[in-house]
Curated annotation (Swiss-Prot):
Lipid bilayer topology: Peripheral membrane protein
Coiled coil residues, start to end: none
Cysteines engaged in disulfide bonds, as pairs: none
This protein's encoding gene: SEC14
GO biological process, one term: negative regulation of phosphatidylcholine biosynthetic process
Organism per entry: Eremothecium gossypii (strain ATCC 10895 / CBS 109.51 / FGSC 9923 / NRRL Y-1056)
Domain (CRAL-TRIO) ranges: 97-270
Protein name listed in UniProt: SEC14 cytosolic factor
Subcellular localization(s) per the UniProt record: Golgi apparatus membrane
Molecular-function GO term, any one: phosphatidylcholine transporter activity
Pfam family, any one: CRAL_TRIO_N
């Protein structure tokens, strides 16, 4: 594996002009001062890894550029990473049951949106926890989530940044609620709650766009009630759509990158792993793969389910 410095030097370090304030390349003098102060206090505290501009600015944005709060968040994250063996997760964790799990809870990446973000799709409405928990456990599902976040950071984003010719820091998420039932939603709530906790606390500011499609009647109205209590920047990233969502998705995702099942033109053969397992994107294209190498997979194509 390349050093952290070698990897950072291999892809663009600035976001596109006009990107969110507080992102690399879009800083005020106050932002720059907070960035340098945070880096200084973390170095003084003995931290040596993940002190690059992009990482520290994500923690600062998550805490409204309050240096003390961002420092506490960063330190908690590093403690969590050590306790969970995150730095060696690619060597230590193998999710051989994923091809089977995907049938009952489809979660996958597929190409990029118009801003170069990896597109992440989760079909929550298709979840079948009863069958899934015959194959795996919630603990292993959450471990796989961490594995995917690390792959996103170490492999998907560098390759996506090279393709976009600017720093890409976030994902474009599609959450498909088609067929969701109250009972299914209640079943998966525990996992979703834990997954959200991991994302918010340890991988902050990774959401670029978030589309909920096939949202049940009344979902949008309920969201409008909560909007006043949410951060305006977060609200601007979230789109609640019913069954007529294709036009809105195609504004953000090129037709050739959007799967056919969602109104696009991208089709994947079963020989390639199908939509759920093919993991197609710039992270699979030699043109955009750098010193980090091609993104690994946590499973083989002919799996034997691994016990917990």
């Amino acid at each position: 594996m390349p050093t952290e410095e070698e990897l950072l030097a291999s892809y663009p370090s600035k976001c596109a002009a006009g990107s969110l304030a507080g992102t690399p390349g879009n800083l005020t003098s106050e932002h720059e001062a907070a960035l340098e102060e945070l880096r200084k206090v973390l170095k003084q505290a003995g931290f040596t890894k993940r002190l690059d501009d992009s990482t520290l600015l994500r923690f600062l944005r998550a805490r409204k550029f309050d240096v003390a709060a961002a420092r506490a968040m960063f330190e908690n994250c590093e403690k969590w990473r050590k306790e969970n063996g995150v730095d060696t997760i690619f060597e230590d964790f193998h999710y051989e049951e994923k091809p089977l799990v995907a049938k009952f809870y489809p979660q996958y990446y597929h190409k990029t949106d118009k801003d170069g973000r990896p597109v992440y799709i989760e079909e929550l409405g298709a979840v079948n926890l009863t069958e899934m928990y015959k194959i795996t456990t919630q603990e292993r599902m959450l471990k796989n989530l961490i594995w995917e976040y690390e792959s996103f950071s170490r492999y998907r984003l560098p390759a996506s940044s090279r393709q976009a010719d600017c720093l890409v820091e976030t994902s474009c998420t599609i959450l498909d609620l088609k067929g969701i039932s109250i009972s299914a939603a209640a079943q998966v709530l525990s996992y979703v709650r834990e997954a959200s906790n991991i994302g918010q606390n340890y991988y902050p500011e990774r959401m670029g766009k978030f589309y909920m499609i096939n949202a049940p009647f009344g979902f949008s109205a309920a969201f409008r009630l909560f909007k006043p209590f949410l951060d305006p920047v977060t609200v601007s990233k979230i789109f609640i759509l019913g069954s007529s969502y294709q036009k809105e998705l195609l504004k953000q995702i090129p037709a050739e990158n959007l799967p056919v099942k969602f109104g696009g033109q991208s089709d994947v053969s079963e020989a390639e792993g199908g939509l759920y397992l093919s993991d197609i994107g710039p992270w699979r294209n030699p043109k955009y793969i750098g010193p980090e190498g091609e993104a690994p997979k946590a499973f083989s194509m002919s799996p034997k389910p691994e016990s917990a």
